[in-house]
């Protein structure tokens, strides 16, 4: 009986997969593979006893109640490992097992029958499992008489069967902490590895943040540098803007002055040459040059309206000088008139009174104007309010009947040379007809002012022929009730210098003003009283300080030298086919030919000669452009453009324009020119001869030729006289129109001799040929890199300056190159 109680229980083996599926959660996988733990459902003591098919019937219910809560010992092959819950339950059940020593078991025959049934059961195909003690009615309880050879060898022990259950239980208890420590160690090791991985991830993120921080710091430094550069750039822009505002103010003031001049009809001042640095024109006259003084007796003999007229004339002259920024102090004469006092005379007036210069050289160049004030003998003052003054201008050839006299009296006409009339040189001129209309006929039967003109004698004319600016000189302006301005009138042969597309600048001369004061007993001539300028003194001494560098001629006035030098740069005169007289401008020729059409020649039988050939240019050989003006046979024709010429040399020069030949080369800079005169003008740049320069009065730029100045002035006026007949585009230069027309005609006249590629413009060909020659004339001053084209250098320099001139209209980004902006715009448009 004791042996039966101490015999261990034997349980059938359970598959490993089922053991892993029903193992406790805290037990590691490796331990489960080494131990074979039976699930609770296979342990009879942990589950209620259920009859199975083939099991023995239960004989008693009493043992069932005692063994229902009992946990048998479980042994396996290999290391014995049990879960903690099973071991605790087994330990708690050792007491009841010890108290059941007297329990009766079924007879051996029944036990053997039960074992045989269990061995044939489908649930027990493996080796049988023995249980040490089992209740009598438990179907799994084995008989104590089972041979030891049929038992598991691991369960055989020399220890007594009585002590075996307790020793196995203590061994299980000793082996139980080992998997728990191992599990804890593995869990800690896994947790440490997880923490290390997190630390590594955090370290990587920290390094990434440090890199991004460094990048941001660099960007901030670049932004600060850009901000400093932008501030410096902005400061320079502010300086430039201040300069522009200052220039704008100066330009605004000049425009106001020009409006005043146009309002006062002072056109002569617009033709004055400006200063070398762009300052205001140098007015060659002073207020005293155009002022008229009266003695006390003469002033007393004047009527009130005459005094008012005198004041208006003086005031108009003063305003004309001030309107052009002419820095003069206010004359005493104007101050006296504003205070209502009598204008006092200078000290020289008394000594010079009554003197009339007889030497023509002592007088000023041009015409002499006399102002004659007439009164009748009675000196009647019956009219309280005198009518306007009757002013009559005797321009040689104007008859008295043209002006008329309501009182039937013809005023005295003091004519020195009636045979030389002004109409000779003013036929066909519109300015004198305007002057004639401006002379308002102011009638008074008792007194009047007659403006008379005198010309210098023929000998003086011949002497001063080259000095005259080829225009009549103007006196100034008469304002108030009576206005009459003597403007420069172009002569038919000298309306404009050659090479220009517009008439030449009019220059103010210094006409001698003769004053005839009123006298009760008759007409009395008074001398002109004014201060002699340095220019007048040179004229009296006969000095000619201005010399032409080309031909050696000298002149008294610089403007005469400038006009004369235009003869040297003339490229194409216009000749009259009837009298072989040449002119500088086509308009002059048209005016001259009008004489032949109207009067049949240069001489009028009624009024004498109407045209003085001395005022025209002397006949000279025709130039290539003479084919456009004048008549005559032209046997030499150009096979390229069908132009005809009268001389073979003219045709040869013209053909150079088609061949592109430039036979004249500068020895200093190796620049070549098509015409010799172009080379001469270019060499003045090297020689430093800047006297012959044409300066723009608006911006101060100087040019070597008047045509270049005229072309430049179109940039200020915005004029575009050359229009394309196909697309109606307009251009300021004819060459630009020619190049534009090639776009429509698809003409490409400039071909590369090496690769045959053709271009519309010549400078495009020059840029292209640098590809073959390897020339790179444009180099960067910062890094020394060289480029073939200038705009490539400008684009490259933006990398050094940081300039980004192309902003995006959709966002705030700016770009250095235009192509980059185009690529960026596609992100907005979605192309």
Curated annotation (Swiss-Prot):
Residue positions, PTM Phosphoserine: 47, 157, 496, 502, 604, 623
GO BP terms, alphabetized: negative regulation of cell population proliferation; negative regulation of DNA-templated transcription; protein heterooligomerization; regulation of transcription by RNA polymerase II
Record-linked PROSITE patterns: KRAB, ZINC_FINGER_C2H2_1, ZINC_FINGER_C2H2_2
Name of the gene: ZNF777
InterPro entries: KRAB, KRAB_dom_sf, Zinc_finger, Znf_C2H2_sf, Znf_C2H2_type
Protein name as catalogued: Zinc finger protein 777
Keyword Transcription regulation: yes
Annotated SUPFAM superfamilies: beta-beta-alpha zinc fingers, KRAB domain (Kruppel-associated box)
Membrane-spanning intervals of the chain: none
Function, as annotated: May be involved in transcriptional repression. Inhibits cell proliferation through CDKN1A/p21 induction by down-regulation of NIBAN1/FAM129A at low cell density.
Subcellular location: Nucleus
Cross-link entry Glycyl lysine isopeptide (Lys-Gly) (interchain with G-Cter in SUMO2), positions: 330, 452
One term under GO cellular component: nucleus
Coiled coil: none
Organism in which the protein naturally occurs: Homo sapiens (Human)
Protein family per UniProt: Belongs to the krueppel C2H2-type zinc-finger protein family.
Subunit structure: Heterooligomer with ZNF746.
């Amino acid at each position: 009986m004791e042996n039966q109680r101490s015999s261990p229980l034997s349980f059938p083996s359970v598959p490993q997969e089922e053991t892993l599926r029903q193992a406790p959660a805290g037990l590691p996988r490796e331990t489960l593979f080494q131990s074979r733990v039976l699930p609770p459902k296979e342990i009879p003591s942990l589950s209620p006893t259920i009859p199975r098919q083939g099991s023995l019937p239960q004989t008693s219910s009493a043992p069932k109640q005692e063994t229902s809560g009992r946990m048998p010992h479980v042994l396996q092959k290999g290391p014995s490992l049990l879960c903690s819950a099973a071991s605790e339950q087994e330990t708690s059940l050792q007491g009841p097992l010890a108290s059941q020593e007297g329990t009766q078991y079924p007879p051996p025959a029944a036990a053997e029958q039960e074992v045989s049934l269990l061995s044939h059961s489908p649930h027990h195909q493996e080796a049988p499992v023995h249980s040490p003690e089992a209740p009598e009615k438990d179907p799994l309880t084995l008989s104590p008489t089972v041979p030891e050879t049929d038992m598991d060898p691991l369960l055989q022990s020399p220890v007594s069967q009585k002590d075996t259950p307790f020793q196995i239980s203590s061994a299980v208890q000793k082996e139980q902490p080992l998997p728990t420590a191992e599990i804890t160690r593995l869990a800690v090791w896994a947790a440490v590895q997880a923490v290390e991985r997190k630390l590594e991830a955090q370290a990587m993120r920290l390094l990434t943040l440090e890199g991004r921080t460094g990048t941001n710091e660099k960007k901030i430094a670049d932004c600060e540098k850009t901000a400093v550069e932008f501030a410096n750039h902005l400061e320079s822009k502010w300086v430039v803007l201040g300069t522009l505002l200052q220039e704008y103010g100066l330009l605004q003031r000049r425009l106001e002055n020009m409006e005043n001049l146009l309002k006062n009809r002072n056109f002569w001042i617009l033709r004055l040459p400006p200063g070398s640095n762009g300052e205001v024109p140098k007015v060659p006259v002073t207020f005293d040059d155009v002022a008229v003084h009266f003695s006390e007796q003469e002033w007393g003999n004047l009527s009130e309206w005459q005094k008012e007229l005198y004041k208006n004339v003086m005031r108009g002259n003063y305003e004309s000088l001030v309107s052009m920024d002419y820095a003069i102090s206010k004359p005493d004469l104007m101050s006296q008139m504003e205070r209502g006092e009598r204008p006092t005379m200078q000290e020289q007036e008394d000594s010079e009174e009554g003197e009339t210069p007889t030497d023509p050289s002592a007088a000023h160049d041009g015409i002499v104007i006399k102002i004659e004030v007439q009164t009748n003998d009675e000196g009647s003052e019956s009219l309280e309010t005198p009518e306007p003054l009757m002013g009559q201008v005797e321009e040689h050839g104007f008859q008295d009947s043209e002006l008329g006299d309501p009182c039937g009296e013809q005023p005295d006409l003091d004519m020195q040379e009636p045979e030389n009339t002004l109409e000779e040189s003013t036929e066909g001129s519109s300015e004198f007809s305007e002057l004639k209309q401006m002379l308002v006929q102011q009638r008074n039967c008792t007194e009047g002012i007659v403006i008379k003109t005198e010309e210098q004698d023929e000998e003086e004319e011949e002497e001063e022929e080259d000095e005259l600016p080829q225009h009549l000189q103007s006196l100034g302006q008469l304002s108030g009730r009576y206005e009459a301005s003597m403007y420069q009138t172009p002569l038919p042969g000298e309306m404009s210098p050659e090479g220009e597309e517009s008439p030449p600048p009019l220059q103010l001369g210094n006409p001698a003003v003769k004053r005839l004061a009123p006298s009760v007993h008759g007409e009395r001539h008074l001398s002109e009283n004014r201060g002699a300028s340095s220019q007048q003194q040179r004229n009296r001494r006969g000095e000619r300080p201005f010399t032409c560098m080309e031909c050696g001629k000298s002149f008294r006035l610089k403007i005469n030298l400038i006009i004369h030098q235009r003869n040297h740069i003339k490229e194409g005169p216009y000749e009259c086919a009837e009298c072989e007289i040449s002119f500088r401008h086509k308009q002059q020729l048209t005016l001259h030919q009008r004489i032949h059409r109207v009067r049949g020649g240069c001489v009028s039988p009624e009024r004498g000669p109407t045209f003085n050939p001395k005022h025209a240019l002397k006949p000279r050989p025709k130039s290539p452009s003479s084919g456009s003006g004048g008549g005559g046979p032209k046997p030499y024709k150009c096979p390229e453009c069908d132009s005809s010429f009268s001389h073979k040399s003219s045709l040869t020069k013209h053909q150079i324009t088609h061949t592109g030949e430039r036979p004249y080369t500068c020895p200093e800079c190796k620049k070549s020119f098509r015409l010799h005169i172009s080379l001469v003008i270019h060499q003045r740049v090297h020689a430093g001869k800047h006297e012959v320069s044409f300066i723009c009065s608006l911006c101060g730029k100087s040019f070597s030729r008047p045509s270049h100045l005229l072309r430049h002035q179109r940039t200020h006026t915005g004029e575009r006289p050359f229009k394309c007949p196909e697309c109606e585009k307009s251009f300021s230069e004819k060459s630009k129109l020619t190049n534009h027309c090639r776009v429509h005609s698809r003409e490409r006249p400039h071909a590369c001799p090496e690769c045959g590629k053709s271009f519309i413009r010549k400078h495009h060909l020059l840029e292209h040929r640098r590809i073959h020659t390897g020339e790179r004339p444009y180099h960067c001053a910062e890094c020394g890199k060289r480029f073939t084209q200038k705009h490539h250098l400008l684009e490259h320099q933006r990398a050094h300056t940081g300039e980004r001139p192309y902003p995006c209209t959709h966002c705030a980004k700016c770009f250095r190159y235009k192509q980059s902006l185009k690529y960026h715009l596609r992100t907005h448009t979605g192309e």
